UniProtKB/Swiss-Prot annotation:
Keyword 4Fe-4S: no
Record's protein name: ABC multidrug transporter F
Lineage: Eukaryota, Fungi, Dikarya, Ascomycota, Pezizomycotina
Chemical reaction(s) catalysed: fluconazole(in) + ATP + H2O = fluconazole(out) + ADP + phosphate + H(+); itraconazole(in) + ATP + H2O = itraconazole(out) + ADP + phosphate + H(+)
Main location: membrane
UniProt gene name: abcF
């Protein structure tokens, strides 16, 4: 109904105070007899009286609404709550008041609506080989050229008045989602033609999508919520975000929001979940249907005048779908809200609630008008609606040539193509009436007219006083931040485990590092260790926030959705998120820094300590903002993570420790000016050394014969020392070694603060401007080379197909034609007294209770029941897929017990379509056929059978298409067909299980799947299928029914009968009501047994079944089937291989699985190019950062740290491998292990082997990119061993890469999540870093940690790599590295140093110097002597290489063992 004013609103129906009953003291209109009353007095008294009566009336409304009694129909907690009555009362309370603002209503008129995008209906799959070929195309498209226009909507027109509901119908790909997004103003990624006309009640599309965003909303079918928030908090947040400035009844905002939350939860039947987590696919929470209702409730709480709902009933049963539509109807009738709803498989009761319907056919409008007139319109065109088909299904069938039925005599008159349907619509009188109505609407509500002013005033009245006039948000920016802070606190409170785990983990990391540098001495021997420790502390503080990239991407979809709802600015959420992270950052900084600072004996003075804490904290905040800005700047997590490794490497290399400033190459030295870490490191180094003098720990010369030398004849053996002094100035040391000066200390702090502010501003701006990547839509992707074939097929239109009248609808075909060559089944699967018990919280619960039944070849059996009845559980038990609990009873095949080959001889079509995204349809089928078909078939026969399956499932047109992911690859129907095809390709000898094959599909796709199942049964397949509340026509497709009640008890097992008469007769005979004419037997059946929402029964139907003659007949038949054990059977064979667990031998499994994994890597260029960037890119960066390094003391130290930084690549490789393995494992454990496709050993070994192969290639490239630019080959020229030592370096790098691969698999093999394995890798990486001998050699380690040095694989990696690349070569000192002192009188420097150099080595710059000349002494003259400082021996290089291979082997076998120990089921409990 159209509601344009408040005059036709209903009242609450409650009694209001009588105007005659006025409280004492009130003025009256009548006067005393002797009182003289003027006209002005009467006017004044009348005005006061009206005001007070109105106030009493409002108070009455408010008290009735917000203070309703316990059993009031307005109390959402009451069992008698009436949603429609509450809505009327709420309307009166909110809008019918003197100080209230008028309600906002929005209709929408659209004409010449053309929407298009740029792309292609087909694309080719990128691989490592062809990805580079796309670069020119991508560049050309980015510059605006080479784009192919794809039209999505063509000349759509319509009018939806305020308070009306529009039903949008069409199969997937018809443009329904695009239409709803366009109407809601969410056109990101879409292009609306400039000539398109849209009028929102006088408001233009630009105004609606900017100043009034949130007044027209689009709700997608995807559920995006914070999983750890409770349902109550999620909806309370939504209610608060849109709560008006003036609250009726004098309530606080919090009370108002809680009341609305309780009401909306009561409306959608989720009141019981108020304290339950929302959850998601990985976090346990409410059920899928309840989560969908949370999504609906969240959007509804905004009370937007125009609401667009895209398949929001997906996952809901028909009763809840109808209830959803009824709630929208109430909103429309009471508040004048306009709703546009795209709905799949709409029940008739839901369809009847709509005012108008729009039907789209491949983007063409073929009808718009009254919902009750739509069927008649298409019947006039010559189409016939079957008697039991719903109107919505009939309208959708117009878009399918195989489904629509043409009346006799209309064969050559009925339209066939989308264009013909659209043309007939344009010529219809209904369209002319529509155009006239649009013209009238546009005249009454002109753009930028008075309606816009009234709408803006109403919206302004709701917004905060501090909010801008043209802002779409209700709350002020401060209010948004406060609200988001509250939510962040709730998230933290609900799940503090991650935060606490990080705190504890970081604290233990600090303890470990502090123990390595425990109680450093206060002399010069601690110089290197102080620098190394401060470097580690700076990195720990700076990179503590690196995982915030992942955190931001986890919630990005949610933030963008709620920003579109106009709940808050994305920047407000970003600011609140940062503020809420500060306590953790401060606590973490305090724990880590206090532990490291004082345990290691850094400068124990108040001023330096607090300055260090100040620098560490500010640097941590700067880097946190950097990572947050980088995450908000990118569109996908791959874009964020891929370059992050290079960025982190640059930040580490150009800190000033690994490469001192004077050694930085000019082409890259600018990096340090942009690096907050370098400013922080300089500041803390100056803070540690400034103003201090350190006693010298060793002198040159010293030892026997030098005990009595004067102070001028010796010098401290460290950089910055001067002869004649026993102490070294800290300022001189940091200036000589690093080029740092004290005047930079506070300057650096200011720079860090400025960087933090600048990065924060950048982050907040990008959150507002940069949106995440959206799906390209359902685009078929082919292998390069076959894409042109697909494009040609795309050109074929409906006119090339036979006419609709010549194609009998598969839907109504009584006997589909059998497909020649498809495997038929002859064995009967039967079960008796099956029970299933599981332990939940130490209590045994029975899930299945004495279930009987059988499946015979050529029959289609439906398994139905209420949610929680155990339908899927029964399938799992019958298919031997349960891994916990106790199963009792018997499951037999032809009277024989099942053997170990049973699982591979049955097909199980899961509800989730799980496939490897990179394979083609044909490859997926061939993989199943080659590994699961019995060995008696040759490879050629198996592949030939695959082609027959392709034809059977009508997949020939897309047999070479890539599976992809939903949205970019196969659509929902094609994915479901592939799921069924994978099971058929295995030639199941026994039967086929299907779990909810039509769940979430539109009616057309559901019919297509049912046609397929019926075709399979006609080809001799035995099928058991779970299905949830099917339509009447779909239900009639089944032959038999197994109906379960709560607790897994059987209610009925037997024939359904023609028109479900057999089934209905059974219930009527046993006390159930008859099925009304035109009712759906499936829904009626559930109502009879009390399984439908709101239904109730006093009859114990499971007990009725046990006492029925039908049950006795079932028992007799089961007894007969047991006798089949003495007869020949297809499951009995003399071939031992037919009883084996797997059809293919282990070498064949390993070969096929390895080939597929290798193929997956090749077809995932993002992974391999990321690996290349990580390894080769990092190696080039390191190589040229240390380009042709010289063999000075500092130069050698730089090269040692070059190897140390190279270990960073190893750790990053481990992080990269882990999630890829999890993807493979999910598919294997969810489907392929259950169906016995191949063994777990083949799975683990093939994944490790393929990683070995790709990492070998990476090792070759990495070696070339690192070894030669650094110039390490020059060290081997002195011993004429360039080839042998270069080969050894390559072999060590190769072994290192294989170690990274095997270690990653060791970590993830037995662990459930990639996050946990990555956390373990992080801890292990820090341990291996710390104890490899570079930061502190074994002589400097506490005795407790020596074992860690010995068992650390990085120890032998570093030792082997440094000895092979640096060892046994001459070295020299730089000018600032020589130690200068005076020789004794009458002696040359050579004579004076002869004895010392014989023991300590080194060389003199001028051994003949004497007298006033100073001796210039270099402590080392050979690299092997230098390496001994790190306990590295050149002679052990081959031993170190061999030990690396030992680690690789141990890791590999450890991964296999851990997978078996933690992931492989060891057997089931069975009685």
């Amino acid at each position: 109904m159209a509601l344009n004013s408040t005059d036709n609103r209903w009242s609450t129906g409650e009694d209001t105070p009588s105007e005659a009953q006025l409280p004492d003291g009130e003025e009256r209109l009548d006067a005393a007899p002797d009182e003289k009353v003027t006209a002005e007095d009467i006017d004044r008294r009348l005005t006061n009286l009206v005001r007070k009566i109105s106030a009493q009336s409002r108070r009455s409304h408010h008290s009735f609404l917000f203070g309703a009694g316990e059993n009031s129909s307005l109390n959402p907690q009451s069992p008698s709550f009436d949603a429609r009555k509450w809505a009327r009362a709420f309307y009166n309370a909110r809008y019918r008041q003197d100080d209230g603002h008028p309600p906002r209503v929005v209709g929408v008129a659209f004409k010449n609506l053309n929407v298009f995008g740029y792309g292609s209906p087909v694309d080719y799959q990128m691989s490592v080989g062809n990805a580079l070929l796309k670069v020119p195309t991508m560049v050309r498209q980015a510059l605006g050229g080479g784009k192919q226009r794809v039209d999505i909507l063509h000349d759509v027109e319509g009018l939806v008045l305020p308070g009306e509901q529009l039903c949008v119908l069409g199969p997937p790909g018809s443009g329904c989602s695009t239409f709803l997004r366009t109407i809601a103003g969410e056109t990101h990624g879409l292009n609306v033609d400039a000539a398109s006309y849209i009028n929102y009640h006088g408001i233009s599309p630009k105004q609606m999508s900017t100043a009034f965003r949130g007044e027209a909303i689009y709700t997608a079918e995807v559920d995006a919520h914070f999983p750890m928030l409770s349902v109550g908090d999620t909806l309370y947040f939504a209610a608060l975000a849109r709560a008006p400035q003036v609250i009726p009844g004098g309530l606080s905002r919090q009370e108002y929001a809680k009341h609305l939350r309780d009401v909306i939860m009561a409306m959608f039947g989720i009141g019981h979940t108020i304290n339950t987590r929302v959850g998601n696919d990985f976090v346990r929470g409410v059920s899928g249907g309840e989560r969908k209702r949370v999504t609906i409730a969240e959007a509804a709480l905004g009370y937007s005048p125009l609401q667009c709902w895209d398949n929001s009933t997906r996952g809901l049963d028909s009763a809840n779908a109808v209830e959803f539509c009824r709630t929208l109807r109430t909103q429309s009738d009471v508040f004048g809200i306009t709703s546009c709803v795209a709905i799949y498989q709409a029940p008739q009761a839901a369809y009847d609630l709509f005012d108008k319907v729009l039907v789209l056919y491949e983007g063409w409008q073929i009808y718009f008008g009254a919902a009750h007139e739509a069927q008649a319109y298409f019947e006039q065109l010559g189409f016939q609606c079957p008697e039991s088909q719903t109107t919505a299904d009939f309208l959708t069938s117009m878009c399918s040539p195989a489904e629509r039925i043409v009346k006799p005599g209309f064969e050559h008159m009925a339209p066939r193509t989308p264009e013909e349907f659209a043309q007939r619509w344009k010529e219809s009188p209904q369209r002319q009436s529509l155009l006239h109505a649009i013209e009238k609407y546009s005249t009454e509500h002109p753009l930028d007219g008075p309606d816009l002013h009234q709408f803006a005033l109403s919206r302004r009245a709701e917004k905060s006083h501090r909010q801008r006039e043209k802002s779409p948000y209700t709350l002020s920016y401060r209010g948004q931040v406060k609200l988001c802070l509250w939510r962040e606190w709730q998230r933290l409170k609900n799940d503090p485990s991650v935060t606490l785990a990080m705190l504890i983990g970081n604290f233990f990391e600090a303890l470990i590092i502090a123990s390595i540098f425990y109680n450093l001495t206060g002399d010069t021997s601690s110089f290197y260790y102080r620098g190394a420790l401060l470097f580690m502390m700076v990195l720990l503080n700076a990179f503590a926030s690196v995982l915030e990239i992942l955190t931001l991407y986890e919630k990005r979809t949610i933030v963008e959705k709620q920003s579109r709802y106009a709940y808050y600015h994305p920047s407000a959420e970003a600011l609140s998120s940062f503020i809420m992270s500060l306590p953790y950052k401060f606590v973490n900084s305090s724990l880590v820094n206090l532990t490291l600072y004082f345990m290691s004996n850094l400068r124990r003075e108040p001023g330096p300590f607090f300055f260090f804490l100040l620098i560490s904290t500010s640097m941590m905040l700067a880097m946190s903002m950097f990572f947050r800005w980088f995450a908000s700047l990118t569109k996908t997590i791959d874009q964020a993570l891929a370059p992050s490794s290079i960025i982190l490497l640059a930040l580490v290399l150009y800190t000033g420790f690994t490469i001192p400033v004077s050694y930085m190459r000019g082409w890259a030295s600018w990096i340090r000016w942009l690096n907050p870490v370098s400013y922080g490191f300089e500041a803390v180094m100056i803070n540690e050394f400034h103003g201090r003098e350190f006693p010298c720990s060793s002198f040159v010369p010293s030892g026997p014969g030098y005990e009595d030398v004067s102070r001028t004849q010796r010098v401290c053996s460290t950089v910055g020392a001067t002869s004649g002094s026993d102490v070294v100035s800290g300022d001189v040391f940091v200036r000589s070694s690093y080029g740092y000066v004290n005047s930079h200390r506070w300057r650096n702090f200011g720079i860090i603060i400025a960087m933090t502010v600048f990065l924060a501003v950048c982050h907040f701006v990008t959150t507002e401007l940069v949106a995440s990547k959206r799906s390209k839509g359902e685009v078929l992707v082919f292998r390069r080379g076959s894409a042109h074939i697909a494009r040609a097929k795309q050109g074929q239109r409906d006119e090339e197909q036979p006419s609709a009248s010549a194609v009998p609808s598969e839907k109504y075909s009584e006997a589909p034609t059998p497909v020649e060559g498809v495997e038929t089944q002859t064995s009967i699967f039967h079960w008796e007294d099956v029970c299933y018990d599981v332990k939940i919280k130490n209590e045994t619960r029975r899930i299945l209770d004495h279930v009987d039944g059988w499946i015979k070849p050529g029959t289609l059996t439906a398994l139905m029941g209420v949610s929680g009845a155990g339908k899927t559980t029964l399938l799992d038990v019958l298919a031997s897929r349960t891994t916990v609990g106790v199963v009792t009873g018997e499951t037999l095949v032809d009277g024989r017990q099942r053997d170990s080959s049973f699982q591979r001889k049955t097909g199980y079509v899961q509800q989730q379509d799980l496939h490897l995204a990179t394979t083609t349809v044909r490859e997926a089928l061939e993989f199943s056929a080659l590994l699961r078909q019995p060995p008696q078939y040759s490879r050629e026969e198996k592949l030939e059978y695959v082609e027959k399956v392709i034809d059977l499932l009508h997949m020939r047109d897309y047999a070479d298409a890539i599976v992809g992911v939903p949205g970019e690859g196969l659509n929902v129907e094609r994915r479901k067909r592939l799921t069924i095809g994978v099971e058929l390709a295995a030639r199941p000898k026994l039967l086929l299980f299907l779990d909810e094959p039509t769940s979430g599909l539109d009616s057309q796709t559901s019919w297509s799947i049912c046609n397929l199942m019926e075709t399979l049964t006609r080809n001799g397949q035995a099928i058991l299928c779970t299905i949830h509340q099917p339509s009447a026509m779909l239900f009639q497709r089944f032959d038999r029914l197994l109906l379960l009640a709560k607790g897994g008890k059987t209610v009925y097992f037997g024939e359904i009968g023609s028109g479900a008469r057999t089934l209905m007769d059974y219930f009527v005979r046993n006390g159930g009501p008859p099925c009304p004419k035109g009712a759906n037997p499936a829904e009626h059946m559930l109502e009879v047994i009390g399984a439908a929402p709101g239904a109730h029964t006093d009859i114990d139907w499971p007990a009725v079944w046990r006492n029925s003659p039908e049950y006795q007949q079932v028992r007799q038949e089961l007894s007969r089937l047991r006798q089949l054990a003495s007869q020949p059977s297809s499951v009995h064979s003399d071939d031992p291989s037919s009883y084996s667990e797997f059809a293919a031998p282990f070498p064949a499994q390993l070969g096929q699985v390895g080939r597929r994994v290798f193929q997956q890597y090749w077809r995932t260029p993002s992974y391999l190019y990321s690996k290349a960037i990580l390894t080769v890119g990092s190696s080039i960066f390191i190589g040229f950062s240390f380009f042709k390094g010289d063999n000075t003391a500092q130069g050698l130290q730089n090269q040692v740290f070059g190897v140390f930084v190279f270990l960073f690549v190893v750790i990053q490789l481990i992080f990269q491998i882990i999630p890829t393995f999890v993807t493979q494992r999910t598919l294997y454990e969810s489907r392929e292990r259950q169906s016995k496709t191949y063994s777990w050993q083949a799975f683990v070994l093939s994944n490790i082997a393929v990683e070995f192969a790709w990492n070998t290639i990476a090792a070759v490239l990495c070696f070339l990119a690192w070894f030669y630019p650094v110039g390490l080959y020059r060290n081997a020229e002195y011993t004429d061993s360039v080839h042998s030592r270069s080969t050894l370096v390559f072999l060590i790098i190769w072994a290192t890469f294989l170690f990274a691969s095997s270690f990653a698999h060791l970590l993830i093999a037995g662990v459930e999540s990639a996050e946990l394995a990555s956390a373990l890798a992080n801890i292990m990486g820090i341990m291996m870093y710390a104890f490899c001998g570079i930061l502190a050699g074994p002589h400097a380690l506490p005795g407790f940690w020596i074992f860690m040095y010995r068992v650390n694989p990085f120890t032998y990696l570093v030792s082997g790599l440094l000895s092979a690349s640096l060892g046994d070569a001459p070295m020299h000192c730089a000018a600032n590295e020589f130690l200068a002192f005076s020789p004794p009188a009458n002696r040359t420097c050579g004579e004076y140093m002869e004895d010392y150099m014989a023991l300590a080595g080194g060389y003199l710059l001028d051994s003949a110097a004497r007298g006033d000349e100073q001796c210039q002494y270099c402590r080392v003259d050979n690299t092997s002597q230098y390496l001994r400082n790190f306990s590295i021996d050149f002679a052990t290089r081959w031993r170190d290489f061999g030990l690396l291979w030992v680690y690789v082997a141990v890791n590999t076998f450890g991964a296999v063992f851990l997978y078996w120990l933690c992931r492989v089921p060891k057997g089931k409990k069975r009685l």
